[in-house]
Structures are given as C-alpha cells and as structure tokens.
C-alpha cells in the first residue's frame, strides 16, 4: 500500500511504480512457484532471478538483475547435486562422481530443464534482447535457472533449495550415468523389453524448438506394454538416450 500511495503522492515514474508493485509477470511467476514446489516468502528474490540485465538497464531507476543470484545458484546447484550423488552411489569413484555431476549441471542439461519448467515465460527481458530472440536463448535460460536456485536458497535455506533441485533434476539422474556405463541406454532398454515383453521399444520424435544454433529435440519412447517416457535433448540421439535412461531406471527397480 505504501508503494501505491508514494507513487500517487510524489508522482514517481511509472518504472518505479512497477518496481514498487512488482506486478509484472505475476501469472507466469506464480505458475513457476507451483511447478518447482516452492512458495517464496520474499517475492523480490524470485523476480530478481527472472530479471535479465537488459531489462534492468532500460529502467529509469537502478534495478537489480540476476547475475549475482546466478553466481550463488551455480554453487548451490553443484553442492546439492554433489551431495545427492555421494549418497546415491557410495561405491562410485571420484572420477565417476565428477563425470556424473558434470553431465547433470552442464549448460545443455540446465537448458533442457529450464525449457521443461517454461522458464522463458517468467523472464523479464529488455526490448533489444527480446527482439533478438533472447527468450529462446539456451544460455540465458540456464543462467536464469541457476539464479532461481540462488533465490530459493536465500529465501528458505539449503534444505528448501535441495528439495527444488531434486524435484526438477531428480528425473535426470539416471541420464548422468550414460557416459559412465559401458553400454548405452538404448541397447539396455532393448535388451530389457525383449526379455520382459518379447518386443522392442518404439521411439518417436515429437518435435523440436529453438533457433538453429541451439535446437532442442523432444522424443518419446513407448514400451511394448504402453508405458511412455519422454525427454528433451540437444540432439535427437541424445534425447533418445535420455528417454531410454528413464525407462531403464523404472524397469530396473
């Protein structure tokens, strides 16, 4: 209420009113909170995480953007993933743990997760960045994802941040084993389905999105019993491996 009164009485510029209210992008940001399973006590943190420097630079008054939160979120993400891998694979060697972590926190991996979360809908971009297709830029999306994790950490601490990391990255953990195992997941899945169902899985390309230099491919694999697994990756081959990894993780339970 004080912000509305101040803007009306003192004739503050519209940009400052907008900053006071923080009402822009309310619906997408609200949906994002539901998706990640965390309701922010301090909404300012989430809005800052979704604010690109190009948007901040266009405002008439100083506005914080997400680069500092990205720095923090990068460290939070690495710690959360490292701890989870350490606990899940007690017999794994350091080199294997490092390779698995690198796969999970790589830019392509984070870009895919950001697209799954529809993070682009919550971003605040400057006019120039928007016109140049910034909302589809993978590096921008992965940076915003890290900033969001930094915001969760500041808002509610490590346990809350770890919970969000596991909700959004947990399904991708089986995929992290792909470069470590000697056999690829598509081969493993075919062996499993032949053994269990006497038939092969069927892969389908659902579509692709993003600019030519940064395309993402959506793939579905259907098992003989009708069970469906989907994944998104930087190539059709990689997406198929990711979908197969999810299927193998389920069948191996």
Swiss-Prot record:
SUPFAM superfamilies: dsRNA-binding domain-like (SSF54768), RNase III domain-like (SSF69065). Mg(2+) binds at residues 70, 143, 146. Its cofactor is Mg(2+). SMART domains: DSRM (SM00358), RIBOc (SM00535). The keyword Cell inner membrane does not apply. Belongs to the ribonuclease III family. NCBIfam families: RNaseIII. This is Ribonuclease 3. It comes from Nitratidesulfovibrio vulgaris (strain ATCC 29579 / DSM 644 / CCUG 34227 / NCIMB 8303 / VKM B-1760 / Hildenborough) (Desulfovibrio vulgaris).
